[in-house]
Amino acid sequence: LDELEKKARAREEELASIPSVKPVRLDHLQRDVQHLSGYGIRLHPVHKVNKMHHGIDFTAPEGTSIQATGDGRVVEVENKKSGYGRSVTIDHGYGFKTLYAHMAQIKVRKGQKVKKGEVIGTIGNSGTSTGPHCHYEVHLYGKPVNPIHYCMDGLSPQEYQEMVEKAEMANQSFD
């Protein structure tokens, strides 16, 4: 029984660590997801060239809370004038890392442990950005993957499919 309990706890820890919620709570997002720029080749709004967009841009009012999408440890905190601006990277273990960029405020520090749903910062417009949003990336074993597959929380299958379609249709990122 002890071995079974140990395996169950380990599986529970793994599931809590894998990114599985959106970085911006559902009640703070525009529900119709009209302003969502997805993963893939996009027109860069500043440089005006087609470029790979390795994340999803979630728009919300400046100052809106950004949450950790899984348990993990903060491995990088940056404050740059260009690029991702104020950003946080979390290592979730199991090969997963997530990046949250263009923040107004960062509320965590490097080395800090965080839990899924914990506020790590606020929506901003820092770095190379054209408006307030959270640029969110998921990396698996060092390679960017489409974050849309890790954003199903709180959505019906129809709402999830609509979000996927909107993200794929957008041809310009916000960063």
Model regions and ranges:
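Catalytic cores of peptidoglycan-degrading enzymes
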Residues: D27-F174
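Non-catalytic extracellular/periplasmic "stalk"
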Residues: L1-Q34
